Every structure is written in structure tokens, then in C-alpha cells.
Amino acid sequence: MIGKLTGILDSVFEDHIILDVQGVGYVVFLSNRLLSSLPERGQAVSLFIETHVREDAIRLFGFETKVEQDWFCLLQNVRGVGAKVALAILSTLPPPQLAQAITLSDIAMISRSPGVGKMVSERIINELKNKALPSNAPHQSMPHFVSYSSETSSQAGTQHTGHQHSMDALAALTKLGFERDQATHALQEAIKAFEGETPSSALLIRHSLKLLSSHLK
């Protein structure tokens, strides 16, 4: 099995490249998004590799990050989704947006991918929404958040609950693949929007995702 390849970009085609690794040219299939961001020919390229072995062919699929490779594999666990469809989805939606679409059950967002209709989009959401989604977020200590408003010391318990909801929401957002600083900023804005209230972690996540989505468009 090949886990990773590092070599020189030899040739670029419509859906794949030839990567020269010490004189051996590997045909590696890539998403359109990755193809459009490649360096000039002759430059070094390093890719995580997923190998598909069939009776008539061996195909290599390349990814810029491990989390993209994990998404590629996870998507193919969904009935009716093969390598071609999985690449089409990753060509249209980077991991954070794909995770967001599944979390919010956003059929339209997934259906933007070429060759992916409403039925397949619904199936992806239904089969993956309760599963652990691939993430590159490291485990870190929780930051200090904007405090929920409090007028008396008797509300200390409410503040503690609110802070716990904030921590739960941040953990969920980073697990979805958002950068920690980006998720923290959106969450702080969400907390301000609920000033005087103690929203659940689910409400904070939904509000934060709307803010993050507006920045991604």
C-alpha cells in the first residue's frame, strides 16, 4: 500500500497528474479543486494517497491533507457513492463546508456537486449525520469566552451552564474542521447575539455555523 508520495509534478491532465518519484511516473487522480491549486510543472508536490485495487486496474487518488483523504473514504461508505462522486463532492466543498452541510442537513449545498442529485445528497446526510466526521482539529484547552450577562450572584449556576455550552459548541465546531481561532470568533459573536439568555450548545452551533457560512461564500 502507498500512503504518501512526494515527487516532481511532471504533467497535468483533466482529472489526474503524473508525479515523478525518483524516475517513476505515478498517475494520481485529484479533485478539481486540488488540480486548480497545483504549483508549476517541475515543482515538488507531496500527496496523501488512497489506493483502489481492482481486477483490471490499480488507481491512486491524491489529497493535500489527511482529513480530505478520510472524507474521501467516508463518503464511499454511503450507498451509491463511488470514487468519482466522492471526488466531485470534494471538488465543490472543502471539508469544513461539507461537514457543515451534513450537520445542517443542507441538501442544496451538497447537490451543487456535479453529478450529485437530491437523492444522493439526502442519503449522504442521513447516513453520515450521526457518525464521527473527519477532522484535523487538535486537542487544546478551551479559551475564555465572553461571559453571559449576570446581575446577581444567584445566577452563577446559569453562567457555569452557559460556559459549558460554549465549550461544547467550540469542540463541535473544531471537530467539523473549522480553524480554532475562526470558530472561537464566530462563537463569541453568537454568544453576544443571545445576551441575557442561556442558549443550548445546539443553538450556539447553529448560529455560529450561519456566521461561518456567510464568510465562506
From Swiss-Prot:
Presence of the UniProt keyword Electron transport in the record: no
Annotated Gene Ontology cellular component terms: cytoplasm; Holliday junction helicase complex; Holliday junction resolvase complex
Keyword annotations of the record: Cytoplasm, DNA damage, DNA recombination, DNA repair, DNA-binding
Annotated segments matching region Domain III: 161-217
One GO MF term attached to the UniProt entry: four-way junction helicase activity
Record keyword DNA damage present: yes
Location(s) in or outside the cell: Cytoplasm
Taxonomy, superkingdom: Bacteria
Region annotation (Domain II) ranges: 65-145
Gene3D superfamilies assigned to the protein according to its UniProt record, in alphabetical order: 5' to 3' exonuclease, C-terminal subdomain, DNA helicase RuvA subunit, C-terminal domain, Nucleic acid-binding proteins
GO biological process: DNA recombination; DNA repair
Family: Belongs to the RuvA family.
Summary of the function given for this chain in its UniProt record: The RuvA-RuvB-RuvC complex processes Holliday junction (HJ) DNA during genetic recombination and DNA repair, while the RuvA-RuvB complex plays an important role in the rescue of blocked DNA replication forks via replication fork reversal (RFR). RuvA specifically binds to HJ cruciform DNA, conferring on it an open structure. The RuvB hexamer acts as an ATP-dependent pump, pulling dsDNA into and through the RuvAB complex. HJ branch migration allows RuvC to scan DNA until it finds its consensus sequence, where it cleaves and resolves the cruciform DNA.
Subunit description: Homotetramer. Forms an RuvA(8)-RuvB(12)-Holliday junction (HJ) complex. HJ DNA is sandwiched between 2 RuvA tetramers; dsDNA enters through RuvA and exits via RuvB. An RuvB hexamer assembles on each DNA strand where it exits the tetramer. Each RuvB hexamer is contacted by two RuvA subunits (via domain III) on 2 adjacent RuvB subunits; this complex drives branch migration. In the full resolvosome a probable DNA-RuvA(4)-RuvB(12)-RuvC(2) complex forms which resolves the HJ.
Record's comment describing the protein's domains: Has three domains with a flexible linker between the domains II and III and assumes an 'L' shape. Domain III is highly mobile and contacts RuvB.
This protein's name: Holliday junction branch migration complex subunit RuvA
Species whose genome carries this gene: Bartonella bacilliformis (strain ATCC 35685 / KC583 / Herrer 020/F12,63)
Protein's gene: ruvA
